Amino acid sequence: MSDKLIIFDTTLRDGEQSPGASMTREEKIRIARQLERLKVDVIEAGFAASSNGDFEAIRSIAQVVKDSTICSLARANDKDIARAAEALKPANSFRIHTFIATSALHMEKKLRMTPDQVYEQARLAVRFARQFTDDIEFSPEDGSRSDMDFLCRVLEGVIAEGATTINLPDTVGYAVPEGYAELIRSVRERIPNSDKAVWSVHCHNDLGMAVANSLAAVKLGGARQIECTINGLGERAGNTSLEEVVMAVKTRRDYFNMDVGIDTTQIVPASKLVSQITGFVVQPNKAVVGANAFAHASGIHQDGVLKARDTYEIMRAEDVGWTANKIVLGKLSGRNAFKQRLQELGVQLESEAEINAAFARFKELADQKAEIFDEDIMAIVSDEEQEHANEHYRFISLSQRSETGERPHARVVFNIDGSEQTGEAEGNGPVDATLHAIEGKVNSGAELVLYSVNAITAGTQAQGEVTVRLSKAGRIVNGVGTDPDIVAASAKAYLAALNKLHDKAVQKINPQI
């Protein structure tokens, strides 16, 4: 009989810590809904005590997602845990994930606490969390570099207090598969009450072994939960990729003898959504979700696949959600057809007014390009949700003039808190002139550190998707804009990034777990 492997997604918490990957509340809700469609077991929606923005995002997700357990991170103190419980209150099912560092280095230099103090605080934190839920996860931060005897003492203590999941993180991505699996196995064998908890792993990819370490811990160490993110999103080199561990376990069920509850046909839609929202492009040769993951260029391979797919394909593209682009709607399509397609794509707009506004954008786009694809519709929805996000800056219109031998000129009209502003400037090119026209009015002082353009679909009529990354005072944000006109998409992306910079939420606490 096979065991169940729990998939714990932390895209919205640890994934968001990747520089530039900060998301709005509305964007987090969209991703959470997609994770629910993916049938993720646990969604770590954020760190409630880190900022009011995270608290509100967690509470909103708890209100709308009903089929996955919603989790908030909390430091091992009453204030953090109570804040997490308050944010999670609307959820059908919720978990509190509390943590404290257990390595000698962290205890001495960061916490300035003795081992006995850390042991007691860990136990008291779990005991306090039990007032709110029976589903409690505990993580010993920097556990892989902790003294084994002390680590086992702490974990035995928190299990005795009611912790139901124990997570042993490879905080700095230093572990190797056999050694990490042995750590999990040894700790489980040394703790007399280890059978009272589910054992979890959380790996970082600094040495490119996050997936390998996680799978080794499952196969050889007895772990039954993997903490991961869509596309491996995360700070530094990223986290364990959800899509890779899930498909490894499903494809090699003969080896792992594990079941996962994931609807794998939702993997590619989830990957595309996270990429679109964060602006982090998926590399073409990325396993499972890369554009070339199922492409065969070799003539020998192509011949084999045509004769029998399993000659060179160990999994089918359609099983993970890859589908050929379909023309789904056109300029003669009506509102009901548009609404039906939104439902098929899993998009839930909050009101009829938002559906009407999105449909109006669709009709505008249909006048500009004859063929409308699913990716176009998703871009429309993304733009529409940004319009309803109480933006400080909002794009209205753009005009430009460019002739050979002359410097391009741009005129941008946009709102600042509802007040219409017009910026004009010249530049080295149309995009440069446009961004200077905006910056001349807002004077943000932000540094442009990345500008990239991608076509959403094939063909010369495709919408362009522009990603702009801005840096200011140590904060890095991404903005994404879409439009058939690349220059207009650039203006939208720049204003979207400025909106995130304008967010007055206190800089969040980003724990290294």
UniProtKB/Swiss-Prot annotation:
What CDD domains does the annotation carry?
A: DRE_TIM_IPMS
Annotated GO MF terms: 2-isopropylmalate synthase activity; acetyl-CoA C-acetyltransferase activity; manganese ion binding
Please give a single GO biological process term from the UniProt record: L-leucine biosynthetic process
Q: Which InterPro entries match?
A: 2-IPM_HCS-like (IPR050073), 2-isopropylmalate_synth_dimer (IPR013709), AIPM/Hcit_synth_CS (IPR002034), Aldolase_TIM (IPR013785), LeuA/HCS_post-cat (IPR054691), LeuA_allosteric_dom_sf (IPR036230), LeuA_bact_synth (IPR005671), PYR_CT (IPR000891)
- State the UniProt keywords alphabetically: Amino-acid biosynthesis, Branched-chain amino acid biosynthesis, Cytoplasm, Leucine biosynthesis, Manganese, Metal-binding, Transferase
Cofactor dependence is on: Mn(2+)
What subcellular compartments does it reside in?
Cytoplasm
The record, for Gene3D superfamilies, names: 1.10.238.260, 3.30.160.270, Aldolase class I
Reaction equations catalysed: 3-methyl-2-oxobutanoate + acetyl-CoA + H2O = (2S)-2-isopropylmalate + CoA + H(+)
Q: From the UniProt entry, list the residue stretches annotated as the region Regulatory domain.
A: 394-513
The record's EC number reads 2.3.3.13
- Class in the EC hierarchy, top level: transferase
Please explain the role this protein plays, according to its UniProt record: Catalyzes the condensation of the acetyl group of acetyl-CoA with 3-methyl-2-oxobutanoate (2-ketoisovalerate) to form 3-carboxy-3-hydroxy-4-methylpentanoate (2-isopropylmalate).
Q: Which family does it belong to?
A: Belongs to the alpha-IPM synthase/homocitrate synthase family. LeuA type 1 subfamily.
Instruction: Read off the PANTHER family from this record.
Output: 2-ISOPROPYLMALATE SYNTHASE 1, CHLOROPLASTIC-RELATED (PTHR10277:SF9), HOMOCITRATE SYNTHASE-RELATED (PTHR10277)
How the protein assembles, per its UniProt entry? Homodimer.
Question: Know the name of this protein?
Answer: 2-isopropylmalate synthase
Organism equals Cupriavidus metallidurans (strain ATCC 43123 / DSM 2839 / NBRC 102507 / CH34) (Ralstonia metallidurans)
Tell me what gene encodes this: leuA
